[in-house]
């Protein structure tokens, strides 16, 4: 187990931290993240799996898993609930807040941890989602209406003091937990015991038999083609009137369903490898997805966002792919949309960055995914001293690629035209760690299951010369990878 207790005493002497992560390594040649999450799900209803692959389909170095959170923190319409899951009677704190961020900061301060160079980038923190509707806290003047699912949470985060990280480069499983510095000797012994329990669980734990997903109705869009095209025309009217330059209109696809989304996740990770792949399970909801797009990333003081805008389906051959790429980079409508969203990304990053540090590090490259290709850029800045990871979420959520420009007015028009609570779609999924870092993706290319219904939501960016029928088809293209994963999962996996 490392660091040693002597090393931790040296860290404690600095007086900056409340917790230090410790790690034990075991060989991973007998285990996979998919097998491990089955074991963790059997041990705890609350669990997650975060994985990554690049656009070239090379797997990222780490897969992160967690189970048995210390607490679950939710907020819905300003009502914040903190449930201490380790307490026998699961005591719950309920309070009304103007913004959940202050409470999140208090919780994170109690676990403040250093970055240990030998360890992976995530060694404990808050994992979960901020919904699209979380914007009500950073933009209180934006009035979001009551819709068909008023109990959909604005935020659902779980605090994980223990992390299981698969290091795919070294073929090791890293078992990580925290040593609290207040009672160092006892906490160190407790951590040794916890790491042994984690090792035993991974090696010998019972595995969950996830029930297969069974659709009880056809997957259908909420807005038929004719209705969606009407919405596009109304959005174009606002553009011509000068209210906005661009707006993203989404179209949910729903079906009644029973069973688990776990096999859908397995298909997605195999057929649609993406920078952000996630499986998330709680008492309230089950999520599976493969998002291509970062919302915001904070490492130390460096902030990064990666706007993706401009879409084409993948070609059947390399030559067809190249032709589609060339056409995409010559499409004035797509280029105009992308440039607007790069400018919006610079503006969002600039709100919390030091003056003069915001720059476009990469501009208009083609990013390939299993079903579609996008134009991508990278915008970065240096975080101001008076700002933190929660400020970063406030500044950038929802992404311009899922709302529009100007963002505030675009969100008002979305509220008027969509007439439904977006929920997770267009929000953020990822982690805020105990060292102050943040890594979140935009909540797209996902399916969630709640109250016996699955939902897949996708959108299209509407600009002045948008063709309504093409925008409807773009929504369908973006949803296609998830729909195919559901269909393939139903056929049965070994």
Q: What does each model-identified segment do?
A:
Residues 1-494:
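Extended alpha-helical targeting/anchoring segments
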């Amino acid at each position: 187990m490392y660091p040693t207790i002597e090393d931790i005493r040296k860290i404690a002497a600095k007086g900056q931290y409340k917790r230090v992560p410790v790690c034990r390594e075991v060989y991973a040649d007998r285990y996979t993240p998919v097998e491990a999450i089955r074991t963790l799900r059997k041990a705890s209803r609350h669990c997650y799996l975060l994985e990554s692959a690049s656009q070239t389909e090379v797997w990222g170095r780490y897969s992160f898993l967690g189970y048995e959170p210390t607490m679950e923190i939710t907020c819905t319409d300003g009502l914040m609930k903190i449930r201490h899951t380790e307490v026998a009677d699961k005591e719950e704190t309920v309070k009304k807040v103007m913004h959940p961020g202050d409470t999140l900061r208090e919780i994170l301060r109690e676990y403040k941890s250093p970055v240990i160079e030998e360890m992976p980038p995530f060694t404990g923190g808050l994992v979960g989602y901020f919904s699209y509707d979380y914007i009500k806290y950073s933009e209180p003047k934006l009035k979001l209406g009551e819709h068909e699912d008023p109990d959909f949470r604005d935020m659902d985060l779980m605090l994980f003091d223990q992390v299981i990280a698969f290091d795919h480069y070294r073929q090791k499983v890293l078992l990580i937990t925290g040593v609290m510095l207040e009672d160092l000797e006892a906490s160190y012994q407790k951590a040794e015991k916890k790491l042994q329990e984690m090792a035993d669980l991974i090696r010998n734990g019972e595995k969950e038999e996830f029930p297969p997903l069974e659709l009880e109705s056809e997957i259908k869009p909420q807005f038929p083609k004719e209705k969606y095209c009407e919405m596009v025309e109304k959005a174009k009217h606002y553009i011509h009137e000068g209210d906005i330059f661009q707006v993203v209109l989404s179209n949910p696809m729903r079906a009644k369903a029973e069973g688990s989304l776990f096999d859908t996740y397995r298909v997605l990770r195999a057929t649609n490898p993406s920078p952000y792949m996630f499986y998330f399970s709680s008492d309230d909801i089950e999520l599976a997805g493969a998002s291509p797009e970062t919302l915001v990333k904070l490492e130390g003081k460096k902030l990064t966002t990666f706007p993706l805008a401009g879409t084409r389906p993948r070609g059947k051959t390399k030559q067809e792919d190249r032709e589609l790429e060339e056409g995409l980079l010559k499409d004035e409508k797509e280029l105009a949309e992308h440039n607007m969203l790069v400018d919006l990304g610079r503006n969002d990053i600039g709100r919390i960055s030091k003056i003069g540090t915001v720059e476009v590090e990469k501009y208009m490259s083609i990013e390939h995914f299993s079903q579609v290709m996008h134009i991508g850029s990278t915008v970065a800045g240096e975080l101001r001293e008076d700002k933190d990871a929660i400020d970063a979420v406030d500044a950038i959520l929802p992404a311009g690629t899922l709302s529009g420009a100007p963002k505030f007015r675009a969100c008002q028009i979305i509220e008027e035209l969509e007439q439904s609570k977006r929920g997770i779609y267009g929000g953020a999924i990822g982690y805020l760690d105990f060292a102050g870092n943040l890594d979140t993706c935009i909540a797209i290319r996902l399916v969630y299951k709640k109250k016996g219904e699955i939902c897949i939501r996708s959108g299209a960016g509407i600009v002045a010369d948008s063709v309504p029928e093409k925008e409807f088809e773009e929504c369908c293209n973006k949803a296609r990878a998830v729909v195919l994963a559901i269909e393939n999962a139903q056929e049965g996996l070994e």
